[in-house]
Amino acid sequence: MSEENGNSHRDGHRDSQRDSLQESQREKHSSSKDITLALRGWDYESGTLNVRKVAGLDGRPKLQMRLDLGLLQMELTGRPDGLKPHGCESLLDYHENRLHEHRARHGTDSEFHLSAEQCQGLREEAVMYYQRYLSLFVIEEFGAVVRDTDRNLRLIDFCGKYAAHEEDKLVLEQYRPYITMMNARAGASIQVSEGKLPDALETITVGLARIKKFFRRFGQEDAYRQCNEARILRRLAKRIKRQLPVDPVARLHRQLQKAIKLEAYEEAAKLRDQIQGMEQGA
């Protein structure tokens, strides 16, 4: 064999070894449980909720929340961890099915109860949905936020009605104002995007009424005026009102009242004439 052919053979052998090593490394990375590659280029920012949607290996989109020591990955529909407890979409669905079966057998809710352990499982599940609707709000998927907040409010009602122990009836109630606020914000945001500003204001009004009802129920009406959830909704309502088209007659009426208050009677007379002319013209 010539020296040239020998060198060529050795070079080809080295190339083959290198390709084999690279392929082995690729396979190792693809099967590795190390999440370093998933986090690369996605730094954790303290004080900021970092969320993204990614394509899952199963072909379905996933929701990821960046944490200081890694990430939280959730399904976008169904139970956030992708599990189906007792073959149901969620534990809440499972226990609601149990209730329906109990009613079918006995014709009443009487004697249907949730044990302390069952309530604990429902609370843990509620946290998963909280983490998801918070993430969904960040990426402005407001319809899904309404879905998940409605669901957690339903869970609070369910535990409140059927928990066997008083503490299990009440432990989630402290979160009702926050969930109600997020539900109203998401619903109003959808309506604003559709140009339905009056509907958005009505959604906020209903949310505020529900929060007020919560505090009244526990004899804490003064706390309602100071609660952060109500302040957030009132600020949102103000922003929406600024987007409403201005009624020129209503604006002139406001100017008239201001002129009368300042005793600017000549200005008030002019404003009355303008109002009268516009109303007659209408």
Region annotations inferred by a language model:
Residues 129-130, 148, 177, 184, ...:
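TPR repeat positional signature
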Residues 116, 161-177, 216-227:
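Acidic, Ser/Thr-rich low-complexity linear motifs
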Residues 2-7, 23-159, 205:
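N-terminal alpha-helical interaction modules that lie
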Residues 104-107, 177-193, 224-248:
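Alpha-helical linker/edge segments of TPR/alpha-solenoid repeat scaffolds
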Residues 132-136, 140, 181, 186-189, ...:
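Conserved small-residue packing positions in alpha-helical repeats and bundles
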Residues 112-126, 168-180, 238-248:
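TPR-adjacent "capping" and linker segments in tetratricopeptide-repeat scaffold/adaptor proteins
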Residues 145, 152, 159, 206-210, ...:
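Alpha-helical solenoid scaffolds that mediate protein-protein interactions
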